[in-house]
A protein has these predicted regions:
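Active-site-adjacent structural elements that line small-molecule/cofactor binding pockets in enzymes
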Residues: 1-207
């Protein structure tokens, strides 16, 4: 993909694909190419790929204390791999994905997530291959908060939560949320409004 984005004509044959004189129809507006990031959970494979090609890293797989340790170790692997391949990676291009829902009060936030959090937990237990909430847990919201896997509360709680993520990882460039439909659409829009009005400005030094 990277040679194509650089405008090169690519002919390549592997055991799972073959391209002959392939080229992209539209060149990248962003130079040298569109920004790219490699997903990375617990395994270092994503970190190795990001470092090898000098790309951003997208850390998924939770934000428990144990997960943050894995994320930090994977970033170190990414940096070391980049150096070994004469590439450059930057923490500003490191994204950490988590779960959150905030409201004007903690009580309201907890009430809001009753709309869909248990269905979310059931989906990851019964359909997806990685249960986020164990089968023997009867209160998903409580479990996720107790294990630092989600923030359900107020803007102040979100600020403290993100600061904990920053400390646990050693620092990253972008905070990302999984769109999980825990709350109905009106409450979800209010969550986004509170994040943009109070939480984001805190980290940009604007409030």
């Amino acid at each position: 993909i990277l040679p194509l984005l650089r405008g090169e004509i690519v002919s390549k044959k592997t055991d799972w694909f073959e391209v002959r004189e392939a080229q992209i129809q539209l060149p990248c507006y962003t130079q040298p190419h569109i920004e790219m990031a490699v997903a990375c959970a617990r395994s270092p494979s994503g970190a190795l790929a990001a470092g090898k090609h000098g790309l951003g890293m997208l850390s998924i797989g939770g934000t428990s204390d144990d997960a943050l340790t894995h994320h930090a170790n994977n970033w170190k692997i990414c940096e070391e791999t980049a150096i070994a391949n004469k590439k450059h990676v930057d923490r500003k291009n490191w994204r950490v994905v988590t779960l959150a829902h905030i409201a004007d009060t903690r009580e309201q936030a907890l009430k809001n997530v009753r709309f869909g959090i248990e269905q979310f937990a059931r989906y990851f237990r019964e359909i997806a291959t990685f249960p986020i909430v164990p089968d023997n847990i009867h209160n998903a919201a409580e479990y996720l908060m107790e294990n630092n896997m989600a923030c359900i509360g107020t803007p102040d709680d979100a600020i403290k939560y993100i600061e904990k993520l920053q400390k646990g990882t050693g620092g990253f460039g972008a905070y990302m949320e999984l769109a999980h439909n825990w709350a109905d659409w009106q409450a979800t829009k209010r969550h986004y409004e509170l994040m943009s009005r109070y939480v984001a400005p805190h980290f940009k030094g604007l409030n």
